[in-house]
Amino acid sequence: DCVDVLLTSEWDDDDFTNFQMSKVNIHPHFFQFDNQASDGVISGFSYDQSMRSYLQFDKKMKDGHHVGMPVPMNAKLLKSTKSGDKTVEIEMAHHSTPFHVGADIMVGIEVPNGKDARWIKSITPDPNKGFAKDHKYKITFTEGMTHAHKAGQIVSTEYVRYRWWVDVDLGLVFWHDHA
């Protein structure tokens, strides 16, 4: 059996609920699993695989700097795409770090049944040579997208996909979140 979960967050960083440090993750209970990070972020010797809000495009600024963590790596599509397209044009959220070659990003992350996760093959202009002043980039993927996407849809790294292949069931299997 396989449990396949795609976890995203809409919880913005703010001073009222989480003191500018929103990071969400989940982990399972009551089945045998690998504790080396494939089954959750806080079980065993695991690196932090939590995500932040894909809806957040701004942060409170103080003296020219963001308060708390930087703006999440979120962007919006500038032009609509068709199924099979291998390139997208985006505008990164201001004050966020641009995506990088080799990263996997999700196009249309807010669309219930129309998301595309793809690896970045190239980015123009190259953010390693300086960030684009207008925050706009053209991204080429390693393969075409399955779905069409409308201009304005969100492109983000802020997701985690969990796939749990359960070896042993030890009772009521469940998972819960941490924020």
How should each PLM-predicted stretch be described?
Residues D1-P72, E110, G114, R118-K121, ...:
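Histidine- and aromatic-enriched segments that form or immediately flank copper-ligand environments
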Residues P72-D104, G108-E158:
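Small/polar beta-strand repeat architecture
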